[in-house]
Regions:
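Blade-level signature of beta-propeller repeat domains, shared across WD40, Kelch, NHL, RCC1
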Residues: 280-319
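Conserved beta-strand element within WD40/beta-propeller blades
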Residues: 68-69, 109-110, 149-150, 193, ...
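Secretory targeting and sorting signals
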Residues: 5-38
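A short loop-to-beta-strand structural motif that recurs across blades of beta-propeller domains
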Residues: 75-77, 115-119, 158-162, 206-210, ...
């Protein structure tokens, strides 16, 4: 079925409606409900998250080293990608959309609805690092570890901002950018970001850019797919970069993961997700790639099979 047919548009609208309906239901379920960080016996509650959004790996954590932001659940949680067991959680927060682990072990998260960047200490203390504007979404730790960069997931704000972790003044790195979503730094020091936002749903126009955060200059990387007729992604939602420079980008609707060579733009299909929608990407230090979902507690794990292919498994986080 070619891109742009009436049947394809109808399918996209149906999936989008299902995702929105699921999100509304999720909000209703968790309204006024905060899961405690620990139970009276000291154990961590295994209540499943409402959704798994932005993710980050914690290099020092034991018993589960992946942090995830749960936007609708207003929490951050750390889990084991092999078993799904939740090892740590901090609830009662804002609309947490994305998260990174700071060099001191604290968590830095974006709060889309509140328009803030917050720091969550491991003892549960929360402080506002910066007020940047509603719609703030993706976050990435600069390679030097002294600041984070944040972008916006709406058409109302086209900036990329640098937020120092020492509380210094926020700087505008670039403006005039397309709608950004989950992004990550590559080994070349550039920030790779998906573009197009939700508006790319019907036209499959989601793409990829690289940003030089030192100068603010951007490069559009034209994607070249093996699939006939495909020129872009239906809602490009997340990016992370492997140590060899391969850029992994997720399509949110009809969710799929692609491996992109930034030098050529060639986008090879890694695999598809069985979930209704994807949200973000995380490349683990062991070579596996995680694909989170907009709603629900499942994370899709793609593991190298040793022959250039991938093995797909699904881990349910919590219970």
């Amino acid at each position: 079925m070619g891109r742009g047919t009436g049947e394809n548009v109808g399918f996209t609208r149906t999936v989008r409606a299902a995702v929105v309906a699921g999100a509304v239901l999720a909000v209703a379920v968790v309204s006024g409900c905060t899961v405690p960080s620990t139970l009276p016996n000291g154990s961590v509650p295994q209540v499943a998250p409402v959704g798994l959004n932005g993710m980050a790996q914690d290099p020092t954590a034991v018993g589960g080293n992946v942090w995830a932001a749960d936007y609708f659940g207003h929490q951050l949680l750390r889990f084991d990608p092999d078993t799904g067991r939740i090892a740590e959680r901090h609830g009662g927060l804002c609309d947490t959309d994305d998260v990174v682990v700071a060099p001191d072990g604290s968590l830095i998260a974006t709060c889309a609805g509140e328009g803030t960047v917050v720091r969550v200490q491991r003892d549960g203390a929360v402080g506002v690092l910066a007020v940047v504007g509603r719609g703030v979404n993706p976050i990435a730790l600069e390679p030097g570890g002294e600041a984070v960069v944040v972008g916006f997931g709406t058409t109302d704000d086209d900036r990329l901002l640098r937020v120092p972790l020492d509380g210094g003044p926020v700087e505008v790195v670039a403006d005039g950018l397309p709608v950004l979503n989950g992004f990550g730094f590559g080994p070349d020091g550039r920030l790779y970001a998906p573009t197009g936002g939700v508006e790319a749903l019907l036209g499959s126009t989601g793409g990829l850019i690289a940003i030089d955060v030192a100068t603010g200059s951007t490069e559009v990387i034209p994607l070249q797919f093996d699939e006939p007729g495909r020129t872009g992604l239906a809602f490009a939602v997340g990016v992370d970069v492997g140590p060899d420079g391969t850029v992994y980008i997720a399509q949110g609707v009809d969710p799929a993961l692609y491996a992109v060579d930034p030098a050529t733009g060639h986008a090879a299909l890694v695999g598809r997700s069985p979930e209704a929608a994807a949200d973000n990407v995380l490349v683990l230090s062991d070579g596996r790639i995680l694909l989170s979902g907009f709603v629900g507690n499942s994370v899709v794990v793609f593991s190298p099979d040793g022959t250039g292919g991938w093995i797909r498994t699904v881990t349910a986080v919590g219970s």
